[in-house]
Amino acid sequence: MKAAQFFLYSLLFFASAALSSANIAEFDEYWQKKSKVAQAKAKKAYTPHPEEVTNHFNKAVHSSFEGNSTRRNLRTNKLGQCLATNPIDRCWRCKKNWSANRKDLVKCVKGFGRKTTGGAAGEIYVVTDPSDDSLTDPKFGTLRWGVIQDRPLWIIFGKSMVIRLKQELIINNDKTIDGRGANVQIAGGAQLTVQFVHNVIIHGIHIHDIKPGEGGLIRDSEKHSGIRTRSDGDGISIIGSSNIWIDHVSLARCSDGLIDVILGSTAITISNCHLTEHDDVMLLGASDTYTQDEIMQVTVAFNHFGRGLVQRMPRCRYGFVHVVNNDYTHWIMYAVGGSQHPTIISQGNRYIAPHIEAAKEVTKRDYAEPAEWSKWTWKSQGDLFVSGAFFVESGGPFENKYSKKDLIKAKPGTFVQRLTRFSGALNCKENMEC
């Protein structure tokens, strides 16, 4: 009996170790230290009162539709005026000098990732070379050289380019990848990996047709290279990281997920993205046994879940997920799902059900009987349901948990098409409103 218990414990231990060192073949002293620092940063980034963050976000959305300035920003585009239809975009898009003040973007983030500053404390680094020839000694001018630096950098692109990554691109702390002003495509190669780091912004790029990388020796900082196992082929993989903002990114056709957020990642905002042509779209929490995902807090806002999508928009485990003012125009199986009692607050989204009669339900609970999942807090507030779509709620009244400081609701689902109309990477020109 004791031998059997020991064997089972050993299996669980090694499974947990393998999970916590995702894609790292040799979990050496460098990665062990980096993992501990990342965990400490994540705990610090976690907010014990997530309702206050949702209230702050809702107030910003509400304010963006008030006053004369709003009417100017929502006017028709017949004369070429700038249209900025949600509070994140209103913060920067209609300023002609955005390219001279790129770092002002950090003032615009909302939701759980609102404290993210990326590389704002560092220099601007210009990518001029789309090649990815060396994984251990990347050339100056390449994207890989920029993201592995140990200091903050605001990374921009000197021209439009297609970058085919030979292996996963491992992004270091305090980085912004800012594609505004160029057509930047990460395509046909390996994924972007944000692992055991903090303070990263990815903005204004296209990511598509991503394949698994075979692994091998890859540099992940100025001072360290390590052996990596096979990467999954996600578009963006966020592993054990905090203070992350993904904004105005277009994603399609990746081998695994478009965006995965796993292993205790938290303080994350995914906003203004356009997601298309994919099955498993967005995974928030990868394992039912990884209870550390309890600290996961993610805002999913102003995104367009578009043509060719099947499921997981997102699929959640544990944690707290605020799904607000997104446009769900396509799914085949379901839109929002989960297991292991995540809290999911759906506010002001538009859900357009497919013509498949069995797929009208927005929600899907996995691996739990109704007696169990009926206790999970899944709430729909102000959502718009089209073509027979419906959201199965559960849990007690979430309103009782709200902070009394701000009880302003998100804009209802009828506003969503306007709020998300400029999702995905934008065609920004320098010295012009974007």
Curated annotation (Swiss-Prot):
Origin organism lineage: Eukaryota, Viridiplantae, Streptophyta, Embryophyta, Tracheophyta
Gene3D superfamilies found in the cross-reference section: Single-stranded right-handed beta-helix, Pectin lyase-like
PANTHER family: PECTATE LYASE (PTHR31683:SF208), PECTATE LYASE 18-RELATED (PTHR31683)
Keywords, in A-Z order: Calcium, Glycoprotein, Lyase, Metal-binding, Signal
InterPro entries, per database record: AmbAllergen, Pec_lyase, Pec_lyase_N, Pectin_lyas_fold, Pectin_lyase_fold/virulence, PEL
Signal peptide: 1-22
The protein's required cofactors: Ca(2+)
GO BP term, example: pectin catabolic process
Recorded metabolic or biological pathway in which this protein acts: Glycan metabolism; pectin degradation; 2-dehydro-3-deoxy-D-gluconate from pectin: step 2/5
Gene Ontology molecular function: metal ion binding; pectate lyase activity
Protein name as annotated: Pectate lyase
